[in-house]
Structure formats: structure tokens, C-alpha cells
Amino acid sequence: MHDAVTRPTPPSDATAWPRRQTHAVQIGGVTVGGGKPVVVQSMTNTDTSDVASSVKQVAELWRAGSEMVRLTVNTVEAAAAIPRIVDKLAMMGIDVPLIGDFHYNGHQLLTAEPACAEALAKYRINPGNVGFGKKKDLQFAQLIEFAIRYNKPVRIGANWGSLDQALAAKLMDENNLREQPWDAGRVLREALIRSALDSAEQAVELGLPRDRIVLSAKVSGVQELIAVYRDLAQRSDFALHLGLTEAGIGSKGIVASSAALGVLLQEGIGDTIRISLTPEPGQSRTQEVIVAQELLQTTGQRAFTPLVTACPGCGRTTSEFFQELAKVVQNHVREKMPLWKIHHPGAENMTLAVMGCIVNGPGESRHANIGISLPGTGETPAAPVFVDGEKKVTLRGDNIAQEFVALIDDYVEHTYVRSAG
């Protein structure tokens, strides 16, 4: 692999790099870039023209914590549905910015359904398929004109699965003339970056302000994505949307996305993220939101809900109870967090530990705000609980889970100041 840019020097301490400075882009009521916290977004997989199903899924994603939601707009029926979806969400008290995902025919759809152009909070434009040949510039310009008319931001989202083939061929020809030609992978990365940057500059020339442009350049390989975004970050001051495209299903998708985005976020690159998971059969679409939040929280970018530290278990642990307790605790704090966020701000930063034996249990529990060390093999059947580093109580018997959860609730009630109202 060839990095196109020099990597920044890491800080000498354990902190991440400072956030990259970008234009601040207002998307509905959410600000992306400009030093604001990294924003979590998601995407529906419903038929957008099915208003009821789309509203239901947007609401689920919003309740899970998605701060922006993207929907496919691929037909006139889908475009016509967008204002109705916005209205129904508003009736439910849900004010989440909706992003229209356009490919091939966006200019035609917005011309046919201008109410869609007005209702959306942002447009996503793919420079690789917005048009071909002589029609490309015209059709791109039509979409930008809608954005200007309705005061909407756009994301210019290049993707190596739909790369501008004319640009790629041009750069391949130029590469053949180099004294030391780049490898094909580097040329394709450059084509992806140039596609995004050139389109952004074209939008600016058409009259779209820089603070209404977000860029992305997605690939499905971890190392390629890191190289692309390092380069893109050094060559522009546009806000950047991060995502590993087609990340995959299950643990593979989670690990690949986290490996790529974690590196970039630690280097201060990225203003909004999406985890592009393929849902497993029967799995909720909200999984991608939870993974995005946990990635941001574990890398120290933001705090959404208390996370539970728990040991994996070994031959010293006597049962699966500590694993079950860890799950109970994590589910409990997730369920409580919407109310805690209102009445007990700061509770999202609380740290919890559920440990399974004496080896690391007491030590890890002391590091947490509240921790419990359950007995392992051959240990006294008692579970000491530590609060802010000090042993507070020892739990015994059949109600340890309920008693520990009650201690957590009591801690939140008395530690995090209740807001008025």
C-alpha cells in the first residue's frame, strides 16, 4: 500500500489527535463538522414509497439514537412519499433530519416532485452515476440548483463500487506516462478522491457555499479506506462522512468498520459516521446505530450510555451468572438512559463493572463508578460492591441482580444532578 500523504505525528500522551478543522454544515437541527461532536447516522431498508413501513423504521432508528436517517429516493413514488413521511414523523414528535439518497435520476425526481426537495434536510449525490458523458455536468448542476433554491446541504459521496469510469481511465492513462507509475490500487484511490473533490469544487462554482457540502469516498477495504480519508482530509476542509461501504454481516462487518473508522477517528478525521452492516435474518436495523455509538464511546469521542466492563470468563468462574448479570445491567442502563439524559445529565459517562472472580474483580470494580466482583470457584459465596473505589456493601443470596441494579439507580439519583422540570 502507498499512503498518498504523510501521516501526522501522534500526541505524546494517551489522547487522540485534535479534531480536524472543517466547515460547519447545518443539516436540519443537527450541525456536522466545525468542531461539533461526531454525528451518528443510519439508513432505512424499506421501500420508501411504503410510508407506514418507512415511518416505523425511521422512528426505530431515531429512538435507538440515530441523529440523521437516509432513505432511498429512486422513483417518483418514493419522492412523493418523502413529505408525507416527514409530516407523520412530526405528528409523532420526531424531528430527525432525513437525507435523500439519489442515484442516476435524482434531477428528474426532484423536478417531478419539488416538495421532496423542500422536505429533505440533505441530498446525497453520487458523482459516479449522476450522469454519463455530456449529460453528467448538466444533471449534476440541476441537483445543485435544487440545493441552492431550497437552502439544502449535499453530501457528495463517491464510492469505488460506482466510480466515475471516465475519470478512472483518464488517471490510468496519466499514470502510464509517469517515470515511476503508481500501482493500480493507488490510481483508483486517487480517482475516488478526485471524483469527490472535483465535484465539490464544481458545486461551489455553481453557487453552493462550502458550508453546505459534506464529502465521502467509500471503499470496502480497511487499509484502503484509511489511506483514502487521510489523503482527503489533508486536501480539503470540507466536513467528512465516514463509512466502510458494504462492511458485511455480523461480527465481520462490526470488526471491519471499527478497525477502519477507529483509526480515522483517533486521528481527528470524520464528522459523521454510519456503520453499514448487513442485518442478520431477524435482526433489528438499529444494530448499526448501537455499534456506531459504542465505537464513538469506546474511542472517547462521545458518551451515549454507561458501558459495562465485564470479564470473558475462564475456569475460575463458577457459573454463567456474571455474564447474565452483565447483560441485565447493560440492558437496564440502555432502557433508563432516555430518562436519565433528561433528569440526570452526565449519567451517560458512568462506568460499571461486572466481574467473575477475585483475580481482577476487585481491582476492575474499584476503577469503575460502580463495580461488583462475583465469587469464582472455591471463593466465599459473596459479591463485594465497590462505589467510586471504595467497598460499599457485600451482596449475598438469590437477589444479587436486583440489588445491584437498585444500587446503580440510587447512585444515578444521588450523583447526577436532576434538572428542573
Curated annotation (Swiss-Prot):
EC number(s) stated in the UniProt entry for this protein: 1.17.7.3
Positions with a binding annotation for [4Fe-4S] cluster: 311, 314, 357, 364
Free-text remark on how the cofactor is bound: Binds 1 [4Fe-4S] cluster.
Pathway where it operates: Isoprenoid biosynthesis; isopentenyl diphosphate biosynthesis via DXP pathway; isopentenyl diphosphate from 1-deoxy-D-xylulose 5-phosphate: step 5/6
InterPro entries xrefs: Dihydropteroate_synth-like_sf (IPR011005), IspG_bac (IPR016425), IspG_bac-typ (IPR004588), NO2/SO3_Rdtase_4Fe4S_sf (IPR045854)
One of the GO BP terms on file: isopentenyl diphosphate biosynthetic process, methylerythritol 4-phosphate pathway
Residue ranges of the TM segments: none
Catalytic activity: (2E)-4-hydroxy-3-methylbut-2-enyl diphosphate + oxidized [flavodoxin] + H2O + 2 H(+) = 2-C-methyl-D-erythritol 2,4-cyclic diphosphate + reduced [flavodoxin]
Highest taxon of the lineage: Bacteria
Cofactor requirement: [4Fe-4S] cluster
Pfam families from the UniProt entry: GcpE
EC class (word): oxidoreductase
Molecular-function annotations in GO: 4 iron, 4 sulfur cluster binding; 4-hydroxy-3-methylbut-2-en-1-yl diphosphate synthase activity (ferredoxin); 4-hydroxy-3-methylbut-2-enyl-diphosphate synthase activity (flavodoxin); iron ion binding
Swiss-Prot/TrEMBL keywords: 4Fe-4S, Iron, Iron-sulfur, Isoprene biosynthesis, Metal-binding, Oxidoreductase
NCBIfam families according to UniProt: ispG_gcpE, PRK00366.1
Stated family: Belongs to the IspG family.
Protein function: Converts 2C-methyl-D-erythritol 2,4-cyclodiphosphate (ME-2,4cPP) into 1-hydroxy-2-methyl-2-(E)-butenyl 4-diphosphate.
Protein name from the UniProt record: 4-hydroxy-3-methylbut-2-en-1-yl diphosphate synthase (flavodoxin)
UniProt organism field: Stenotrophomonas maltophilia (strain K279a)
Lineage, opening ranks: Bacteria, Pseudomonadati, Pseudomonadota, Gammaproteobacteria, Lysobacterales
